[in-house]
Structures are given as structure tokens and as C-alpha cells.
């Protein structure tokens, strides 16, 4: 089940001053809140919402991380490699939880995701993303819907 302590929420002090990236970050917080709600009292109707929210989370992780990484590459950001490593480590943690849920159906495990996402994101934005504040601009960032990147429709991959 989900944890009883409240989820961190988006606050304006988390802004990196890049509109589309801020919008992505806000969407992560909203998605975590939805996941928190649907894992609190799961029933058969909620199982569909859980799976849907997991699919959206996977798409958002892949698409948002690629969006940021492309913008950092375009801006010749000095800490791109380290930033990618932080993204990859988080994505791996989330993937392991999702795989466990899909294999076992454990609502308890998937119920840890909302806090994992918001706690990680809150820290990551304040510490890691804050380093590119003032370096990345709206002009650096691909503002297409994340599905283009998450679905592999993007041709300028970061390696």
C-alpha cells in the first residue's frame, strides 16, 4: 500500500526557469499523486489506473530524461555525463519496481513509487538540475510532446 506520509508537491522554488522542463517536472508530481491515490485502496477498477499510470510514468521518464539530455548536449553542458548517470540510476530503480509489480502483482511494491518519484525528483531538481539553471534556456529545449521521444521517434539520440 502507499505510504501514509504526504507526498512532496511541486513548489515554485523548484523551477529551473525553462518552461517545458518545469511543466514536465510538475507533471511528474501530479502523476505521483494519482498513483498514490490509486494504490491507497486498490480494487479491480483501480488496477487499470495503476497499469495506466505506470505506462505514463515509463513514458515520462524516458521522454523527459531524453529532452533534458538533448538540451544539455545542445548547450555543451559540462556535467552531461554525470546527469545521464543520475537519470539512468533512477530509471533502473523504477524499472525494477515496475517489473516486480508486473511479475507478482504486489500493490505494496508499486505503492512505493509515488514517494520514490517525488522524493527523488525533489532532491534531483534542487541539487542536480539546479546546476544547469541559467545555462539551459527555452531555446535549447525540444518542446514536442514527450511521446515523440519516448516512442523512439526522436532521431537525435544522446549517447
Language model features with spans:
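Small-residue-biased structural context
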Residues: 1-159
Amino acid at each position: 500500500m502507499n505510504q501514509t506520509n504526504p507526498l512532496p508537491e511541486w513548489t515554485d522554488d523548484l523551477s529551473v526557469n525553462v518552461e517545458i522542463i518545469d511543466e514536465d517536472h510538475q507533471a511528474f508530481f501530479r502523476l505521483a499523486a494519482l498513483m498514490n491515490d490509486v494504490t491507497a485502496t486498490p480494487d479491480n477498477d483501480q488496477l487499470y489506473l495503476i497499469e495506466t499510470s505506470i505506462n505514463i510514468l515509463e513514458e515520462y521518464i524516458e521522454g523527459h530524461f531524453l529532452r533534458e539530455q538533448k538540451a544539455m548536449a545542445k548547450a555543451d553542458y559540462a556535467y552531461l555525463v554525470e546527469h545521464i548517470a543520475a537519470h539512468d540510476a533512477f530509471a533502473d530503480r523504477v524499472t525494477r519496481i515496475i517489473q516486480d509489480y508486473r511479475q507478482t502483482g504486489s500493490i505494496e511494491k508499486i505503492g512505493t513509487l509515488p514517494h520514490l518519484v517525488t522524493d527523488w525528483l525533489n532532491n534531483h531538481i534542487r541539487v542536480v538540475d539546479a546546476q544547469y539553471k541559467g545555462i539551459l534556456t527555452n531555446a535549447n529545449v525540444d518542446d514536442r510532446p514527450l511521446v515523440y521521444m519516448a516512442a523512439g521517434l526522436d532521431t537525435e539520440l544522446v549517447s
